[in-house]
């Protein structure tokens, strides 16, 4: 048997009341605690597996709505930074639930690495439990407030010239760049794409490549090279 768990205190931190408190108990049970238990109990690994998928969905939806013009590759880059072990560990710390983890005496979480893994898994298992008990809505309400604000997510995407250009034009002109594409087929049947990027209906850059995405990046980089250099004082977006 595990020691008494203050269900009410944990629910207050999660801002969620379980109809099946047993799910919360399971979510708090680290595999090492199960291994040292004299009686058969269920550990958190299955809930962790579920919570990982739920977290991915919630973060994907959040980014999709927050950045309506970002391409999927850039969104994936940002998502990876918001669902990794370091991020999940931070969410557990923000919720203040780490001390409730039931962990075996032989498990070392004194080191930063040990705490990172244990806390990250705890958040995912808790999220899985909330989802099973209440569905996607309370799982979303638990997760979204923990995510960093828009201005802190943007740097996660800044390696892509399209994103840098978008940040620049939004800050300077409150408009989004527009990409116009023309497909060109040569005599051998090879297709390439000619892209123009327009800002306020003015052509800022052009790109040509066999991939539409790559041509857009080339056009965006040309726009940054030309117009960004003219506005170096305002490029820190």
Curated annotation (Swiss-Prot):
<dbReference type="Pfam" id="PF14622">
    <property type="entry name" value="Ribonucleas_3_3"/>
</dbReference>
<dbReference type="GO" id="GO:0005737">
    <property type="term" value="C:cytoplasm"/>
</dbReference>
<dbReference type="GO" id="GO:0003725">
    <property type="term" value="F:double-stranded RNA binding"/>
</dbReference>
<feature type="binding site">
    <location>
        <position position="124"/>
    </location>
    <ligand>
        <name>Mg(2+)</name>
    </ligand>
</feature>
<keyword id="KW-0255">Endonuclease</keyword>
<feature type="binding site">
    <location>
        <position position="121"/>
    </location>
    <ligand>
        <name>Mg(2+)</name>
    </ligand>
</feature>
<dbReference type="Pfam" id="PF00035">
    <property type="entry name" value="dsrm"/>
</dbReference>
<dbReference type="GO" id="GO:0010468">
    <property type="term" value="P:regulation of gene expression"/>
</dbReference>
<dbReference type="GO" id="GO:0019843">
    <property type="term" value="F:rRNA binding"/>
</dbReference>
<keyword id="KW-0698">rRNA processing</keyword>
<keyword id="KW-0540">Nuclease</keyword>
<keyword id="KW-0460">Magnesium</keyword>
<dbReference type="GO" id="GO:0046872">
    <property type="term" value="F:metal ion binding"/>
</dbReference>
<keyword id="KW-0694">RNA-binding</keyword>
<dbReference type="GO" id="GO:0006397">
    <property type="term" value="P:mRNA processing"/>
</dbReference>
<feature type="active site">
    <location>
        <position position="52"/>
    </location>
</feature>
<dbReference type="InterPro" id="IPR000999">
    <property type="entry name" value="RNase_III_dom"/>
</dbReference>
<comment type="function">
    <text>Digests double-stranded RNA. Involved in the processing of primary rRNA transcript to yield the immediate precursors to the large and small rRNAs (23S and 16S). Processes some mRNAs, and tRNAs when they are encoded in the rRNA operon. Processes pre-crRNA and tracrRNA of type II CRISPR loci if present in the organism.</text>
</comment>
<comment type="similarity">
    <text>Belongs to the ribonuclease III family.</text>
</comment>
<feature type="binding site">
    <location>
        <position position="48"/>
    </location>
    <ligand>
        <name>Mg(2+)</name>
    </ligand>
</feature>
<keyword id="KW-0963">Cytoplasm</keyword>
<dbReference type="GO" id="GO:0006364">
    <property type="term" value="P:rRNA processing"/>
</dbReference>
<keyword id="KW-0699">rRNA-binding</keyword>
<keyword id="KW-0819">tRNA processing</keyword>
<dbReference type="GO" id="GO:0008033">
    <property type="term" value="P:tRNA processing"/>
</dbReference>
<dbReference type="InterPro" id="IPR014720">
    <property type="entry name" value="dsRBD_dom"/>
</dbReference>
<comment type="subunit">
    <text>Homodimer.</text>
</comment>
<keyword id="KW-0479">Metal-binding</keyword>
<protein>
    <recommendedName>
        <fullName>Ribonuclease 3</fullName>
        <ecNumber>3.1.26.3</ecNumber>
    </recommendedName>
</protein>
<keyword id="KW-0507">mRNA processing</keyword>
<dbReference type="GO" id="GO:0004525">
    <property type="term" value="F:ribonuclease III activity"/>
</dbReference>
<keyword id="KW-0378">Hydrolase</keyword>
<dbReference type="InterPro" id="IPR036389">
    <property type="entry name" value="RNase_III_sf"/>
</dbReference>
<feature type="domain" description="RNase III">
    <location>
        <begin position="7"/>
        <end position="135"/>
    </location>
</feature>
<dbReference type="InterPro" id="IPR011907">
    <property type="entry name" value="RNase_III"/>
</dbReference>
<feature type="domain" description="DRBM">
    <location>
        <begin position="160"/>
        <end position="229"/>
    </location>
</feature>
<feature type="active site">
    <location>
        <position position="124"/>
    </location>
</feature>
